[in-house]
Design a protein with these regions (language model features):
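Sequence-structural signature of mature extracellular/luminal beta-sheet repeat domains
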Residues: 1-175
Length: 175
């Protein structure tokens, strides 16, 4: 389902789904009672409201209800992946080829970019697209290529790809 966040829950022997319209949902992060989603132009922060979940029909079937509590405008930066590290939200800013953290005072706050990226540029130079945590800290990011030209990754779509260790800024896997 394009343009929808799909929420699922067990309902006896079946899986029940609920579709919530969102504009281009991609990256998602979960932290205790929070569900945070990167969308076409921002970040939506939803919070679990258990007391309200009990009022949903049919009664007794819902143990969580995530309601929108905050929206942050980022612009069209193509958020591909997100994660909570302690109390800070980090996300992959694919258009600017960098890792960012949420800062309510700015559209985004860049904290790291690959060594092969020479400047912040909204033209997607390497298609930075994934991240992974280790021991609760962001440790790895992935990109489709090591290119530093606007859209240069497209020429390596099927034969590129790297994983970078943020601890030492080294490529630990490539295709």
């Amino acid at each position: 389902q394009a343009g929808k966040l799909v929420l699922m829950r067990a309902d006896g022997e079946i899986t029940n789904t609920h579709f919530r319209p969102m504009r281009k949902p991609m990256g998602m992060a979960v932290k205790s009672d929070r569900l945070t989603v990167g969308t076409a132009f921002g970040i939506s922060d939803l919070r679990n409201t258990p007391a309200a979940a009990g009022t949903l029909e049919p009664h007794g079937k819902h143990d969580a209800l995530f309601l929108p509590r905050a929206e942050y405008y980022t612009g069209d930066i193509d958020i591909h992946e997100m994660a909570w590290q302690n109390n800070e939200l980090f996300f992959v800013n694919t258009r600017f080829s960098c890792l960012c953290k949420l800062n309510p005072d700015y559209s985004f706050d860049p904290v790291w970019r690959p060594a092969f990226i020479s400047a912040y540029d909204p033209r997607d130079r390497c298609h930075l697209n994934g991240l992974a945590l280790r021991d609760g800290k962001i440790r790895y990011v992935s990109a489709l290529s090591q290119t530093d030209t606007p859209g240069g990754w497209r020429q390596h779509n099927s034969d590129g790809g790297v994983v970078i260790d943020l601890q030492n800024n080294q490529i630990v896997a490539d295709k």
